[in-house]
């Protein structure tokens, strides 16, 4: 007596059809790709802000050759802090690109995401602090302060003020990108 059991083939196997399997990654992979693209945009914004501020310089040609008025970013410690910080943010974003690629390849791995969200938050804080402090100085350069007898210098140093204002705007674009990166990393770390 034989103890074999005949199991008929299912209709899917007989017809050569496979069971549909959900694509691995899903929306987390889409977030990881968007993360990579935003990091590239953040590099451009922060590097542009640092380069624009670092090259802001204007000399007024009136008076004599030995006595001239000059406005430069290195005349203000706040602007020096701004240039250094935005260069650090750009450098961090460049160094974070491989971790972003790992998040694309392995979208369900929490390690790279956790690492990125912590460092993104640190550099978001630095970028916000430097952008806000530079914005305060640019505001004073444009409007002055009557109570402190600080005169507006943008009437005389128009090119310098235009460059510093553009650098501050670029820094706040980088800040918005970093905020989006933190939010996206937090969404990707959700368990649901």
Curated annotation (Swiss-Prot):
All ranges on the Extracellular side of the membrane: 52-80, 135-166
UniProt keyword annotation of Plastid present: no
Topology in membrane: Multi-pass membrane protein
Domain of life: Eukaryota
Segments traversing the membrane: 31-51, 81-101, 114-134, 167-187
Record key words, sorted: Cell membrane, Cell wall biogenesis/degradation, Membrane, Transmembrane, Transmembrane helix
A UniProt-annotated Pfam family: CASP_dom
Keyword Membrane annotated: yes
This protein's GO CC annotations: plasma membrane
Cross-referenced InterPro entries: CASP/CASPL (IPR006459), CASP_dom (IPR006702), CASPL (IPR044173)
Chief location category: membrane
Residues exposed to the Cytoplasmic side: 1-30, 102-113, 188-192
Annotated localization: Cell membrane
Biological process terms in GO annotation: cell wall organization
Role of this protein: Regulates membrane-cell wall junctions and localized cell wall deposition. Required for establishment of the Casparian strip membrane domain (CSD) and the subsequent formation of Casparian strips, a cell wall modification of the root endodermis that determines an apoplastic barrier between the intraorganismal apoplasm and the extraorganismal apoplasm and prevents lateral diffusion.
Subunit: Homodimer and heterodimers.
Similarity-based family: Belongs to the Casparian strip membrane proteins (CASP) family.
Name under which the protein is recorded: Casparian strip membrane protein 1
Organism: Vigna unguiculata (Cowpea)
Organismal lineage: Eukaryota, Viridiplantae, Streptophyta, Embryophyta, Tracheophyta
